[in-house]
């Protein structure tokens, strides 16, 4: 079993290394000793060793790179846990989807039902029978974590909260959340209401990727409603300028939970901490995980969406060659200092390629491997545009050519 190091150990190691370094004030004050031994030769491709992740006081947790999806560290990440108000990440996803496709508008007025008004737990203080704009309810849910605002949104989109929960589960299925099931929109405890740290991280990544126009709501520090100032419960928003979301959660049975995203120098990380013993513990754990990821890893973009990777000959086609590439940006995350060792290999799934090909048709695979040969990513190669068949003479000539291929 790998021993986890406390977050303070990283600072201590750095201090000792600095004090011992030639030219440091401490080293200069030390009496001269024997001549230092020559350094041990290190291969140029070797990276500094990556230490164990920091010790985290929580039931389960995960650290994931947003762009590559690589898990940098985790503990019991697939264990079922109560999500508490992290449930509202999926509520937000469903509402954002309704906004994006025009079924809902930010200015739509939602009538507050008695069911929403009587919601237990945290509140936005909306009153039964009043009409409240959707954009205010979104802030009430995301910033204040109000259960009343959350249920009002669920009823506005789904008709009833029960019907909305079915929509949540369908989106969970589409996003590949294999350890998640919802029975309500706000996260109050129920035996059939559960998730996992990995699923929460996957959902957080989907929110950032699919709804960049709405994601800034998660960084709103406070807002006013009914002359009540309502603040964001995510304390890291005020402590780390790179943190720009996502959501807190807490019930007595779930403990203190926090899903966090931060962006530094183009690298975005997502951490999820479930079942911490206190607000302080969940924030310290999240900060330590993010610091670990940014200190010891880096993410690079290897290919851009629709970038041509191969231009193979296409038989029986109107044009002799076709552009084959990747359908989306390709990223990988490696230990710092190892980016130069990353290699890519493009391989067609069958040869020769014969027209017609449709745009987006899968024709191969791009493999990404590190210096040791370990495969990091597998990305489909697709036809970047349609390749129609050529004329009768072209098809006849290539039919003969294929006999000798």
Residue ranges and their predicted role:
Residues 21-211, 222-226:
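Active-site-adjacent loops and short helices of periplasmic peptidoglycan-processing enzymes
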Residues 10, 52-54, 74, 262, ...:
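Sterically constrained small-residue positions within well-ordered secondary structures
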């Amino acid at each position: 079993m790998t021993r986890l190091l406390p977050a303070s150990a990283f600072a201590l190691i750095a201090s000792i290394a600095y004090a011992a370094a030639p030219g440091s004030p401490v080293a200069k004050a030390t009496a001269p000793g024997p001549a230092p031994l020559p350094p041990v030769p290190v291969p140029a491709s070797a990276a500094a060793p990556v230490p164990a992740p920091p010790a985290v006081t929580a039931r389960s947790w995960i650290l994931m790179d947003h762009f590559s999806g690589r898990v940098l560290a985790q503990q019991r990440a697939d264990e079922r846990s109560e999500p508490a108000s992290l449930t509202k990440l999926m509520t937000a996803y469903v509402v954002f989807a309704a906004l994006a496709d025009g079924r809902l508008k930010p200015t739509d007025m939602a009538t507050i039902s008695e069911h929403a008004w009587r919601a237990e737990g945290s509140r936005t203080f909306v009153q039964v029978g009043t009409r409240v704009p959707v954009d205010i309810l979104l802030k009430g849910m995301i910033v204040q974590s109000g259960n009343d605002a959350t249920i009002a949104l669920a009823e506005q989109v789904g008709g009833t909260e029960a019907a909305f929960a079915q929509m949540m589960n369908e989106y969970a299925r589409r996003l590949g959340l294999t350890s998640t099931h919802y029975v309500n929109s706000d996260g109050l405890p129920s035996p059939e209401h559960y998730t996992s740290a990995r699923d929460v991280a996957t959902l957080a990544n989907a929110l950032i990727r699919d709804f960049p126009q709405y994601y800034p709501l998660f960084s709103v520090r406070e807002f006013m409603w009914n002359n009540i100032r309502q603040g964001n419960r995510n304390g890291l928003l005020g402590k780390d300028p790179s943190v720009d979301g996502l959501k807190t959660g807490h019930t007595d049975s779930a403990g203190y939970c926090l899903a966090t995203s931060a962006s530094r120098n183009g690298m975005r990380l997502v951490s999820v901490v479930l079942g911490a013993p206190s607000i302080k513990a969940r924030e310290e754990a999240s900060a330590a995980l993010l610091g670990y990821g940014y200190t010891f890893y880096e993410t690079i973009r290897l290919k851009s969406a629709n970038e041509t990777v191969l231009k193979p000959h296409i038989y029986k086609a109107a044009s002799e060659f076709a552009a084959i590439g990747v359908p989306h940006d390709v990223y990988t995350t490696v230990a710092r200092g190892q980016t130069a060792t990353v290699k890519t290999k493009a391989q067609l799934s069958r040869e020769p390629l014969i027209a017609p090909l449709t745009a987006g048709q899968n024709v191969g695979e791009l493999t990404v491997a590190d210096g040791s040969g370990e495969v990091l990513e597998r990305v489909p190669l697709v036809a970047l545009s349609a390749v129609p068949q050529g004329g009768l003479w072209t098809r006849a000539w290539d039919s003969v050519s294929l006999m000798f291929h």
